[in-house]
């Protein structure tokens, strides 16, 4: 073959190769554009989900806040009705526990006001035979407060006790009745 034909064939082959390369690049560009559009659509959908979930979180936070407020209102109501305040509740391996203050407003002088702090525990077990544990909390009481409590409450209420759940109402009534007693005056000789 003559050199011109060889050169012509070589150029034609390069042009065909370049056309094939351009066609491949156009095809790859199209595929990548489709993927990009798909990813953009996915991103929009995910952003909508995120916005929806954020709205749900905000609503749940509002509900939680309202429930906490309602819980405090209920605690306040119980305190006004029964002079009982549940400060904290928690659960451990042994059962469900409550930190409680029970007091009285006898309407008299402020020195006749008494509060008994205690823990009540409901031991895990069968519901019919649930055992209640009572543990007085006296550590942060002044001598005067302890004297006032001792003058009103039976001695056994200064010790840890256990009793069946069915007796809980009697227990509450005993403490309430005792705390409502008028304070016995100290002997002047003490």
Swiss-Prot record:
Keywords: Centromere, Chromosome, Coiled coil, Meiosis, Nucleus. It comes from the Eukaryota. Transmembrane segments: none annotated. Residues 31-70 form a coiled coil. One of its GO terms (cellular component) is nuclear envelope. Component of the monopolin complex which promotes monoorientation during meiosis I, required for chromosome segregation during meiosis. Also plays a mitotic role in DNA replication. Present with 1920 molecules/cell in log phase SD medium. This is Monopolin complex subunit CSM1. It comes from Saccharomyces cerevisiae (strain ATCC 204508 / S288c) (Baker's yeast). The lineage of its organism: Eukaryota, Fungi, Dikarya, Ascomycota, Saccharomycotina. The gene is CSM1.
């Amino acid at each position: 073959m003559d050199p011109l034909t060889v050169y012509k064939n070589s150029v034609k082959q390069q042009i065909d190769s370049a056309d094939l390369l351009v066609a491949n690049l156009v095809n790859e560009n199209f595929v990548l554009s489709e993927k990009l559009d798909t990813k953009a659509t996915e991103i929009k959908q995910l952003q909508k989900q995120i916005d929806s979930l954020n709205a749900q979180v905000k609503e749940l936070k509002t509900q939680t806040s309202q429930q906490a407020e309602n819980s405090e209102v209920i605690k306040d109501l119980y305190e006004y009705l029964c002079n009982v305040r549940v400060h904290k509740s928690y659960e451990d391996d042994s059962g469900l526990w409550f930190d409680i203050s029970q007091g009285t407003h006898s309407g008299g002088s402020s020195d006749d006001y008494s509060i008994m702090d205690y823990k009540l525990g409901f031991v895990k077990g069968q519901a019919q035979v649930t055992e209640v544990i009572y543990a007085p909390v006296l550590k942060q009481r002044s001598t005067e407060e302890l004297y006032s409590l001792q003058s009103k409450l039976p001695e056994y209420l200064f010790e840890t006790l256990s009793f069946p759940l069915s007796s809980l109402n009697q227990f509450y009534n005993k403490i309430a009745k005792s705390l409502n007693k008028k304070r016995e005056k100290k002997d002047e000789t003490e």
